[in-house]
A protein has these predicted regions:
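Alpha-helical transmembrane segments and their helix-helix packing motifs
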Residues: 1-139
C-alpha cells in the first residue's frame, strides 16, 4: 500500500510538471509569433520532462513501455493505473489553477485555439486507433 501511495503522489507531481511544460509551450506560442514560438515552446516543454526525469517522478507515458519487457513485478502493474490517475489529477489541477488565473486574458484564447486545433486533428482519426494510441502512449 505504501508503494501505491508513493506512486500516486509521484504521479500527481509528474502531472504538475507536464502541466507546467504545456503551459510554457502555450506562453511561447502566445508571446512569440510564428514558427519560432512553437519551436521555443517545444524546447521549454522539455522542462516538464526534465523535471520528471531528474526528480524520478512517475509519468505513465514513461512507464507503460516497460510492460513489454515482461520483467516487472505485480506491484508495477498495479501502480500503472494509480500513477495514471495521479498524472490526471496533477495535470487537471494545474490546468484548473491556470484557468482561474488567466480566464479573462488573451492567454486563454491561445490555449483554446491550440486545444481546438489539436482536437480537430484527432477527431478525424479512427476511434479505436485513438484509444489504443492514447492508452499505450504510441508504443
Amino acid at each position: 500500500m505504501k508503494t501505491q501511495l508513493l506512486s500516486f503522489v509521484k504521479g500527481i507531481l509528474a502531472g504538475l510538471a507536464i502541466g507546467l511544460g504545456g503551459f510554457l509551450y502555450v506562453l511561447m506560442v502566445h508571446f512569440v509569433q510564428g514558427e519560432l514560438g512553437r519551436v521555443l515552446g517545444s524546447l521549454l516543454f522539455a522542462v516538464g520532462l526534465f523535471t520528471v526525469c531528474t526528480c524520478m517522478l512517475h509519468l505513465y507515458t514513461g512507464k507503460i513501455g516497460m510492460v513489454y519487457e515482461g520483467k516487472q513485478t505485480k506491484d508495477f502493474y498495479i501502480s500503472l493505473p494509480v500513477m495514471l490517475i495521479g498524472n490526471a489529477i496533477g495535470a487537471f489541477g494545474f490546468g484548473f489553477a491556470l484557468w482561474a488565473i488567466f480566464k479573462d486574458t488573451s492567454v486563454m484564447e491561445t490555449v483554446n485555439r491550440i486545444c481546438t486545433s489539436r482536437a480537430t486533428l484527432v477527431s478525424f482519426d479512427d476511434f479505436l486507433a485513438v484509444i489504443v494510441q492514447s492508452t499505450l502512449c504510441g508504443v
